[in-house]
Amino acid sequence: MTDSPVLALAKELISRQSVTPADAGCQDLMIERLKALGFEIESMVFEDTTNFWARRGTQSPLFVFAGHTDVVPAGPLSQWHTPPFEPTVIDGFLHGRGAADMKGSLACMIVAVERFIAEHPDHQGSIGFLITSDEEGPFINGTVRVVETLMARNELIDMCIVGEPSSTLAVGDVVKNGRRGSITGDLKVKGTQGHVAYPHLANNPVHKALPALAELAATQWDEGNAYFPPTSFQIPNLQAGTGASNVIPGEFDVQFNFRFSTELTDEEIKRRVHSVLDAHGLDYGVKWTLSGQPFLTDTGELLAAVVAAVEEVNHQAPALLTTGGTSDGRFIAQMGAQVVELGPVNATIHKVNECVRIADLEKLTDMYQKTLNHLLG
């Protein structure tokens, strides 16, 4: 039996070993299809990262599909039922690295746009694609650089669907209409090294810092709101000492992370953290890394169109959630764009034997096409 257009393209993409930041020819496949539809293509290569920006039309509104061609490493090959870069169909599921995150989504986007343009060759507004090979990596030279380039020339995205695997049990059961912000602090507390038998001749930075860390961990940073849970504070890494049991350390390194809602700003978080550390009299320094601001699309044409499209396919409205980690949507939202995430079920992403239900790819294609119908048809 001949593969459907979306399954055939998904297989082609999965077969290319595009472990981040490699693209391995995935974008060329997409570009070839988009050129045939009349898209203007602009390649944007920054260091080791391959990106492209494609646009069809010059009018507003500008609707964009955003995604990434890179995938995480396959992990232990012995644990895969099938080779991770040899797309294989088993019992109605397409197996392979990137099947759900997010080469399946990319195939759905392309086929949906092909079908939409066939029905609406003179559609309203403009359609764009923003594709990167640097989403699974350090996200330095990917979407953020493309967004900076577009903003510098005042080419602003109005509405964007990011194809991240948002769904939990069935495709379209969850639409992500926002994400929390993320900021990390690398704290170094200074003390005086010494012998554990002579603590009066030393100053243990661990002992000094623990009460402050306990206070930070116990703090209610905010109460969240209708769209976001309360801001969370977590300590993922601690490091002190030489490894010897008889040496008081001279320094104590602590890494902590906030996932924060729209109730807080990164500057407010910094101010409150420094206030606690200062109150405990610590000799310290903090290096802050802001990974992304929170964003929220709580109303607007895009959200209404996506919800309607999902309802038409599933006969049930999706849940609107802001849970999970960060995504490239945070960079696009900086333009003032309406941004939502809609993609496959995320149960197997980043795992061995990653897979996606083939029927879900067909449904997702329909959801994308119906969204275009509502917005630009």
Swiss-Prot record:
Zn(2+) 1 binds at H68, D101, E164. Keywords: Amino-acid biosynthesis, Cobalt, Diaminopimelate biosynthesis, Hydrolase, Lysine biosynthesis, Metal-binding, Zinc. Binds 2 Zn(2+) or Co(2+) ions per subunit. Pfam families: M20_dimer (PF07687), Peptidase_M20 (PF01546). Its cofactor is Zn(2+); Co(2+). One of its GO terms (biological process) is diaminopimelate biosynthetic process. Zn(2+) 2 binds at D101, E136, H350. The keyword Zinc applies. GO terms for molecular function: acetylornithine deacetylase activity; cobalt ion binding; succinyl-diaminopimelate desuccinylase activity; zinc ion binding. It is an enzyme of class 3 (hydrolase). The keyword Metal-binding applies. Pathway: Amino-acid biosynthesis; L-lysine biosynthesis via DAP pathway; LL-2,6-diaminopimelate from (S)-tetrahydrodipicolinate (succinylase route): step 3/3. It catalyses: N-succinyl-(2S,6S)-2,6-diaminopimelate + H2O = (2S,6S)-2,6-diaminopimelate + succinate. The active site is at D70, E135. Its EC number is 3.5.1.18. It comes from the Bacteria. InterPro entries: ArgE/DapE_CS, Bact_exopeptidase_dim_dom, DapE_proteobac, Peptidase_M20, Peptidase_M20_dimer, Peptidase_M20A. Belongs to the peptidase M20A family. DapE subfamily. Homodimer. NCBIfam families: dapE_proteo, PRK13009.1. Catalyzes the hydrolysis of N-succinyl-L,L-diaminopimelic acid (SDAP), forming succinate and LL-2,6-diaminopimelate (DAP), an intermediate involved in the bacterial biosynthesis of lysine and meso-diaminopimelic acid, an essential component of bacterial cell walls. This is Succinyl-diaminopimelate desuccinylase. The gene is dapE.
